[in-house]
């Protein structure tokens, strides 16, 4: 007889990151269905999805709700802020976050599996190409948030080593879509 493991999906399907959250939810749901359909596994995964709706405080509330229901494995939290928001709750309850999104690095918790890449892993190859194709002057624009700050720090260092120049460094609110 297969035993059941409760898992949680903490993914916003509304708000700024709804496209990412909806795709992640669809992918996770498909993967969980495949796992549960495989008779070789001695377990099934029982899923509970919480939709924080893109509100930072709702991630912590959702994580606590999942853990109070017995969930010890949580998948999701799209942003660094949402991940950081729930780490104290995870650590207090001995639960594990499976964090698949890119993150800024320089963080370590025994209660988080960091599965996504860091800015240096994508920016360095991109900047090598951009420096050759477009020259050594750049404008660095990012979200006023740890991901934007860290990405621009890496970009600035690469440009400096290459003898390039940062013409502008600007940060905008998360969710900004209009630029003039």
Which residues are covered by each model-predicted region?
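An alpha-beta-alpha
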Residues: 115-171
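Extracellular glycoside hydrolase catalytic/binding regions
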Residues: 95-125
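Extracytoplasmic "Venus flytrap"
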Residues: 2-4, 8-29, 50-52
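A short, Lys/Arg-enriched amphipathic alpha-helix followed by its capping loop at the start of a domain
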Residues: 27-41
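Short beta-strand elements in bilobed, periplasmic/extracellular small-molecule ligand-binding domains
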Residues: 37-54, 109-111, 159-176
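Alpha-helical structural signal in soluble globular domains
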Residues: 31-35, 85, 89, 93, ...
């Amino acid at each position: 007889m297969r035993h059941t493991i409760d898992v949680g999906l903490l993914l916003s399907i509304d708000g700024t990151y709804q496209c990412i959250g909806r795709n992640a939810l669809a992918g996770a749901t498909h993967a969980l269905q495949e796992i549960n359909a495989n008779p070789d596994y001695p377990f099934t995964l029982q899923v509970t999805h919480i939709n924080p709706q893109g509100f930072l405080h709702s991630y912590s509330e959702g994580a606590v709700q999942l853990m109070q229901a017995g969930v010890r494995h949580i998948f999701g939290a799209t942003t660094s802020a949402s991940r950081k928001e729930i780490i104290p709750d995870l650590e207090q309850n001995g639960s594990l976050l499976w964090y698949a999104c890119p993150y800024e690095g320089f963080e370590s918790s025994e209660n988080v599996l960091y599965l996504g890449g860091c800015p240096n892993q994508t920016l360095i190859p991109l900047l090598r190409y951009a420096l050759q194709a477009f020259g050594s002057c750049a404008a660095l624009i990012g979200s006023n948030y740890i991901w934007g700050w860290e990405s621009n720090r890496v970009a600035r260092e690469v440009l400096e080593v290459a003898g390039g120049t940062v013409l502008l460094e600007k940060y905008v609110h998360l969710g900004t879509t209009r630029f003039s």
